[in-house]
Structures are given as C-alpha cells and as structure tokens.
Amino acid sequence: MIQLKLTFIYVLVAGVLSAQNFKAGAIGGISTSQVSGDQLGGFNKVGVKLGSFVNHPINSATRGELAMYYIDKGSNDLNSNFRIDLSYIETSWSIQKTSKGFIYEGGLLFSILVDGKTYDIYGYEDITKGDFNKIDIGAKLAAGIKLKPKLLMFWEITNSLPFTPFQDHPGGASYGLNKGKYNSILSFSLRYLYSK
C-alpha cells in the first residue's frame, strides 16, 4: 500500500516537474466600476489594473490561468463630490477557452483590501463610513482576442458574490441576498506574454 502511494506521488511530481508549458505575462488596463447599494448608477469610477499572470494549457483549446494584480474599485457621483475609493490586490483563477478567433474566460476572484475611503458630497473624508470588509470574493466573465502572437486584448465584467459584500448595510440590515454593498467592474486590459 505504501509503495502504491509513493508511486502515485512520484508520477504526480514527475508530471508537474516535466510540465514546461507555463507562460507568464503582464496585465495593464483600465477599470470602470460602480457599487450596488449606494443609490447611484453607472460605471463612473475610473481606475487602473496592473499585474501579472501565468497560464498552462489543459488541451489545445483550453488553458488554466492564475493572475495577481492591483485594481481600483468604488463609486463616483458625477453630480457631487461623493465617492467611494477602494484599492485591492486581487487574484483571479480562471479557465480560458479559444473558439473561432476569440478567447472566452470565466473564473473566481479573491481580493484583499489595501485602502478604502468614503468621501461625502462636499469631498471630505467620512470616517464614519470607512468600515469596509477586508475581503471581497467575486466572479468574472471575459472575452478577448489575440492582437499579435504575444499581445492579447480582453474585455471583462466582474461582480462580488451575493454573500460577500465589501460593506454591510447600516445597522446590519439584510434583504434576502442583498447583505450590503457590492462591487461591479467593467474593465479593458492588454495582456502581454513574455514568451510565445
């Protein structure tokens, strides 16, 4: 029995060590975001998305990808100085499928809050509304195209999952799946592969 386990571990480790198909690259782009639950509408908060990724082929048309990047999220009222500024370090675990010249991607996100502030309608920081949850868990869908052999362009939509708001409603009020405020992001990014 022990020999069987050791053989299994050896085969598994040998397979991983012989896998030289990993590809790494850089991500750079723009994020536009809104907050569900702040009584505002529109993706009016503009920010940056910067980081890196590594992917590995599963088969000829499918890849698994792990990415880590900095991203700005939050909300911005165009009629006043009210805004929510959130900065995250985010990891993305996704599966990519290539079909008819397009790359389709779906996956999960895990974000750690780096900095978060709320500003009132006059532009002053409102420290009474700075009680943000440190973790935001979400899901994403994306579509992309290959511009050049080492350059990809992606459009992505992400949203916090219903049970993980980044901020609770005042007084802890809850309405079904609506437990608080949630991030919704539309982003555009370029992904550059370091090697083909």
Task: Label the model's feature ranges.
Residues G41-I89:
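Glycine- and aromatic-enriched membrane insertion/assembly motifs of diderm outer-membrane
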Residues A19-N55, R191-K196:
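Short glycine/proline- and aromatic-enriched beta-strand/turn motifs that initiate or cap beta-hairpins
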Residues H56-S60, I95-G101, L147-P149, Y194-K196:
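Outer-membrane beta-barrel strand-turn architecture
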Residues S36-G42, N76-F82, G116-G123, P165-G172:
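Outer-membrane beta-barrel translocator domains and adjoining extracellular loop/strand segments
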Residues I30-Q34, M68-G74, K97-S99, F110-V114, ...:
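Transmembrane beta-strands of outer-membrane beta-barrel pores
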Residues F22-K23, S60-G64, G101-Y104, P149-M153:
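Repeated loop/turn-to-beta-strand initiation elements of outer-membrane beta-barrel proteins
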Residues N76-D77, A139-L141, K146-K196:
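Predominantly the C-terminal beta-signal and adjacent terminal strand-loop region
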Residues G42-V48, D85-I89, T98-K100, N133-A139, ...:
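Residues that define the transmembrane beta-barrel architecture of outer-membrane proteins
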